[in-house]
Amino acid sequence: AHAANTVEVQEFMISPAGAPSFKDGIRWCTEVFHALAALLKERGLATSVGDEGGFAPDLGSDEEAIECILEAVEKAGYKPGEDFVLAMDAASSEWKSATKGEYLLPKSGRKFTSAELIEHWKQLCEKYPIYSIEDGLDEEDWEGWQQLTKALGDTVQLVGDAFFVHN
């Protein structure tokens, strides 16, 4: 993970999918960044940043992080799912347990099989405007990646960073 907090997903990212130009997209992202900083300050949360420049507040869950980001998108005057979509870097290779096909989430202690983790990603993608998941499964979970691709590959960009770097 890139920050010490209670969120399992390593990084959440925004993409200005509705921006008419690159220049506008950069401006939009900057506006959301500042709206998120203000929102975190209002809630008494830290606005320190992680290793790659993103905020690292101590939030209770991945969903709380997503909801904060979407609230900041709205606060900046944009529409989630239309003007902005989300991406996540799960870095789930770090969750691999000693049992093949099992994931142990380090902060919550929850356990998932590959199938359960795929269902978790599917539910998040149905509930929120998520367009990309990076490292949604462990780099050695070949069968899981096939199932993840079947479940989400037509609607969500699946990025295999660790999968391709280490295989």
Which functions belong to the PLM regions below?
Residues 1, 12, 16-17, 52, ...:
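Fold-independent oxyanion-binding glycine-rich loops
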Residues 1-50:
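Mobile "lid/hinge" segments at catalytic clefts and subdomain interfaces of large enzymes
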Residues 11-22, 46-62, 94-108:
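Active-site-proximal beta-alpha loop/turn segments in soluble metabolic enzymes
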Residues 25-28, 56, 85, 149:
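Generic preference for flexible, low-structure residues
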Residues 26, 59, 134-135:
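Short acidic-aromatic active-site loops that bind/stabilize oxyanions
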Residues 63-167:
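Catalytic core of soluble alpha/beta enzymes
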